[in-house]
Regions:
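Conserved catalytic network of the ASCE P-loop NTPase/AAA+ motor domain
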Residues: 61-64, 102-104, 119-122, 149-154, ...
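Hydrophobic positions on the alpha1 helix immediately C-terminal to the Walker A/P-loop
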Residues: 54, 58
Length: 222
C-alpha cells in the first residue's frame, strides 16, 4: 500500500547562474526534452565532464511543472555532497535520505542513496541515478527494481555514469535506453590518449612482472 504522490506548486527554483559549454548545453537540452517526453536516457560522460551542472535544467523544468524529483546515488558521501551543492543552487526545500539521515519530509527535490528508493512507490516524475556503475547499485536486481517502482507510471529516468555497465549496454542495444556520450571535460579539450613508451627492453619488463606474479600479491598496472 502506498499514498499517491501529490503534485507540488510549480516554481522557478534554479538559482545557479553558471554557463555550460556547447557540449554540455546540447546534453542539457536533450535531458529537458526527455523530461517533456517521459523518456529513459543514459548520459555516458567522462569524469570531470560536469554531469551535475548538465542535469540542472531538467530538474528545474520538472519542478517548474509541479513534479517531484529524486537524485539517487549508491554512495552516502556523494549524496551528502550533492545535497550541499543543490541546496545552494535551488530555492526549494530538499530532503536528504541515507542510513543516518533525519526522518523524511515531503519535498519537491529528494537526494538519496539508491537503497532509500525502496521506500518509495510511484513517487517521482524525474528520477536521476548518479554513478550507476558503482557498488552497490551496479548489476543489483533489487535496486534496479526499486528504481523502477519509485517512478510514476509516466516518468523520466536518467542514468549518469563515466563507466557504462553490461546491463545498461544491453538496454541501449535493445533500444530500451537512449545513450548520450560526452568524451570531453568541462574545459572542452579532448581526452589525452596514452601512448606506450618503453624505456627499457620488453624482456626486462616481462621478467619483473613474472617475478611479481610469483610473489602472490596483486599487481596493478598503469
Amino acid at each position: 500500500y502506498h499514498l499517491p504522490q501529490q503534485s507540488f506548486k510549480g516554481i522557478d527554483a534554479l538559482l545557479w547562474t553558471g554557463t555550460l559549454t556547447p557540449y554540455q548545453a546540447d546534453i542539457s537540452k536533450q535531458l529537458v526534452q526527455a523530461v517533456d517526453q517521459k523518456k529513459q536516457i543514459l548520459v555516458h560522460a567522462v569524469t570531470g565532464a560536469g554531469k551535475t551542472e548538465m542535469i540542472y535544467a531538467a530538474i528545474s523544468s520538472s519542478i517548474a511543472s509541479g513534479g517531484a524529483v529524486c537524485i539517487a546515488t549508491p554512495r552516502t558521501d556523494v549524496a551528502r555532497e550533492l545535497y550541499t551543492r543543490l541546496s545552494n543552487d535551488f530555492s526549494v526545500p530538499i530532503s536528504l535520505l541515507h542510513a543516518d539521515s533525519p526522518p523524511y519530509f515531503r519535498t519537491p527535490l529528494v537526494i538519496s542513496t539508491t537503497h532509500q528508493l525502496l521506500r518509495f512507490r510511484e513517487a517521482f516524475d524525474l528520477l536521476i541515478i548518479d554513478e550507476v556503475d558503482a557498488f552497490p547499485f551496479a548489476d543489483n536486481p533489487a535496486l534496479y527494481y526499486a528504481a523502477e517502482h519509485a517512478q510514476k507510471t509516466a516518468a523520466t529516468l536518467v542514468y549518469l555514469t563515466a563507466t557504462s555497465t553490461d546491463t545498461l549496454d544491453k538496454l541501449v542495444s535493445s533500444d530500451l535506453l537512449k545513450r548520450i556520450t560526452l568524451s570531453r571535460r568541462f574545459h572542452g579539450h579532448p581526452l589525452v590518449v596514452p601512448k606506450p613508451i618503453f624505456s627499457q627492453p620488453e624482456k626486462i619488463i616481462y621478467r619483473h612482472i613474472q617475478k611479481q606474479r610469483n610473489s602472490g600479491f596483486p599487481l596493478l598496472l598503469f
